[in-house]
Swiss-Prot record:
Protein name: Small ribosomal subunit protein bS20
Gene name per UniProt: rpsT
Similarity comment text for this entry: Belongs to the bacterial ribosomal protein bS20 family.
Its biological purpose: Binds directly to 16S ribosomal RNA.
Organism: Deinococcus geothermalis (strain DSM 11300 / CIP 105573 / AG-3a)
Stretches the record annotates as Disordered: 1-26, 76-95
Pfam families documented for this protein: Ribosomal_S20p
PANTHER family: 30S RIBOSOMAL PROTEIN S20, SMALL RIBOSOMAL SUBUNIT PROTEIN BS20C
HAMAP family named in the record: Ribosomal_bS20
Lineage: Bacteria, Thermotogati, Deinococcota, Deinococci, Deinococcales
Amino acid sequence: MALRHKSAQKRHRQSLKRRLINRSRKNTIKTFSKKAVVAAQNGAENAVELHRKAESLIDKAAKGSTLHKNAAARKKSRLAKALNKAKAAQAAQPA
């Protein structure tokens, strides 16, 4: 890639740096979301805490424009739906 102008070179460096930061944040969100769902399905005590942490990470990513606000809302909604489904399944099972 032939970037001839200094400003273009700098913007390219900055975009690569931002890309790494954004990828890291998105991977962390995915990890905590999966952990929260698995914990809820297994009936773990820390499922609510993991859910809260995942939602917090999603909100922070949306605030910093790593995620679009609508994408963040969608992720939070789907996470809550999955956790509620897991809780309902746990409650339906005989003890």
